[in-house]
Structure formats: C-alpha cells, structure tokens
C-alpha cells in the first residue's frame, strides 16, 4: 500500500508541466570528450567499455559535458558491470587537483557494432545514477559504425514510472527541436519511448578545437621526404602494371562491343559499371606520380646525406 502511495505521489508530481523534462533539452559534448569516448570504445572492441562524464547542468534545457574518464570494468557483448565507487572517488580527487572540478553528469558506454540503445543491465545502471541525480544522462556510442564525419552516438534517460502508470507524456514539448531526429528502429525494438527516451546531442567546438580537428590527420610537408622500401615499391609497381594490362584488355573488348550497339543501347550499357578507360587513366596517373615523387625524394635525400 505504501509503495502504491509513493507511486501515486510521483505521478502527481510528474503531471505538472513545471516538474517535467522538455523535448528541447540538449546534451552538449565537447570535442575532447567525444574523442576520448571514441578512442576508449575502439580500444575495447569487441568488448563493451564504460566511463563517467564530467560537466554541469546549466539550466533545464542544457547539459554540458566537458570531459570524460574511463572506468576499469569487465564487459560482455551486451552489458557492462556497475561503477567502481573507490576508483571513481580517487579519480575525482586527482581531477580536482588539475583544476577539473566539474560534477558527474552521467555515464557512457560502447555498443561495438550493434547500435545505440539500452539493455536491461544498462537500464538498471541508469536507475542507480538517476537515484543520485534525476537528470543524469546515459550516452551510448558505437565505435564500429562511426566513420569520419558521422559519429553513431545517442543519449538516453529513463521514463518516470508515474508517467507510465497514468499514460502521461514523459516530457513536455515547447519546441520542434526534439522532433527533428528520427528514432532508430533498433532502439525502438529495445524499449525506446517505452522505458527510456532519447535526448538531443550537439557538439561545442571552439575555434582552436576546430583547427585541431582539421589538422588531426593532415599530411605534413616532411611526409613528402619519407623514403619507402625499394622492394615494396617494386612490388607495387609490378602490381600496378599488371592491373593496367588487365584494364587495357577490358577496354579493347569494350570498343569491340560498342561497334555492335545502337546509340540508345550505349546510353544504358555501362550505367553502374566501371569505366575501363577512366580507370586505366587514373591508375597510370597515380603510378607515374608515385614514381616521380619516389625518384625526387631519393635525389633530395642523397644530396642531403652528402
């Protein structure tokens, strides 16, 4: 009976618009935090990894994540163990000594290769975080499906039990911000909008961080003076020559076929197929450029050594 009364009290609180979350609420993740999460997730493949997020709750619509740190735990393909409280306390003390005095705003973990959603173990872990802070966020990142220019990541929070009992909307809608992103079908199957809802994610980048990210994999001028092994270069040249001979045979065969085709058939004959002429030209140009650069590099290095 007491449990039912507590649930009813929670539902009354949740029915007021002032006490409900908003669909406009956005999690802002810094560049360094995102890079750390991706690097940690890729290092743990094929196992799951987890860590804690540091930041602040700016207002009712903004959660700012400025940094993350990894947690030592064992994981399986679908779950990770709970947080190590002793390690967390020691890590927070050491971070405060470096000037990182932000609070824990949630946790993150990886789903290598199978999308962003919360399993039953993840839901229980999130419950423990929300008992400490009702606005705690669970971020899931997929390091396998993430590619350059597109990070597969999502943020979640559990739906209030009282709202579920009274069939109330878990969040109030004051703008169209929360409706711009289409829900993932895989997450819907695993309980999205039934047990937990998705939060908007955005990224804070300063001018210096943008410059740093642009130069992350940028070629330096010194890379042009790097000497490659002559045997490997000879093997690559031989492979390129064999490839060009094969492409030339395909091109001559294509010319013979074109003689028997009409203009209408030629328009759709090679749609979606590789163009032997273009491929031959690109392969020849690439081989010539690589060999010219290799010869010039060898000459520069021989003069520099003298």
From Swiss-Prot:
Name of the protein this chain belongs to: Ubiquitin carboxyl-terminal hydrolase RPN11
Query: In which residues is Zn(2+) bound?
Result: 109, 111, 122
What's a Pfam family in this record? Answer: JAB
* InterPro entries the record matches: JAMM/MPN+_dom, JAMM_MPN+_peptidase_M67A, MPN, RPN11_C
Enumerate the Gene Ontology biological process terms. mitochondrial fission; peroxisome fission; proteasome assembly; proteasome storage granule assembly; proteasome-mediated ubiquitin-dependent protein catabolic process; protein deubiquitination
Record the organism: Saccharomyces cerevisiae (strain ATCC 204508 / S288c) (Baker's yeast)
* Coiled-coil intervals: none
Q: How is it modified after translation?
A: N-acetylated by NAT3.
């Amino acid at each position: 009976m007491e449990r039912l009364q507590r649930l009813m009290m929670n539902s009354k609180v949740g029915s007021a618009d002032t006490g409900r979350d908003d669909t406009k609420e956005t999690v802002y993740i810094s560049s360094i935090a995102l890079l750390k999460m991706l690097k940690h997730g890729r290092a743990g493949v094929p196992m799951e990894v987890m860590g804690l997020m540091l930041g602040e709750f700016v207002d009712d619509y903004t959660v700012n994540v400025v940094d993350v740190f990894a947690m030592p735990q064992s994981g399986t393909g679908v779950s990770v163990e709970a947080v190590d409280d002793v390690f967390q306390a020691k890590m927070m003390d050491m971070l405060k000594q470096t000037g990182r005095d932000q609070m824990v705003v949630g946790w993150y973990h990886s789903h290598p290769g199978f999308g962003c959603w919360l399993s039953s173990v993840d839901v229980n872990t999130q419950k423990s975080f929300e008992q400490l802070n009702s606005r705690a966020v669970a971020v899931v990142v997929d390091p396998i499906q993430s590619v350059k220019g597109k990070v597969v990541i999502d943020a979640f929070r559990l739906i209030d039990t009282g709202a579920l009992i009274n069939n109330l909307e878990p969040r109030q809608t004051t703008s169209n911000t929360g409706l711009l992103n289409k829900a993932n079908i895989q997450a819907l199957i695993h309980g999205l909008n039934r047990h937990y809802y998705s939060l908007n994610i955005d990224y804070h980048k300063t001018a210096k961080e943008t410059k740093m990210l642009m130069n992350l994999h940028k070629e330096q001028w010194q890379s042009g003076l790097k000497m490659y092994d002559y045997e490997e270069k000879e093997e690559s040249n031989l492979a390129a020559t064999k490839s060009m001979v094969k492409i030339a045979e395909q091109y001559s065969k294509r010319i013979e076929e074109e003689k028997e085709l009409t203009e209408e058939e030629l328009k759709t004959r090679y749609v979606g197929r590789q163009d032997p002429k273009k491929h031959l030209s690109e392969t020849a140009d690439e081989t010539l450029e690589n060999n010219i650069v290799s010869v010039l590099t060898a000459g520069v290095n021989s003069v520099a050594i003298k």
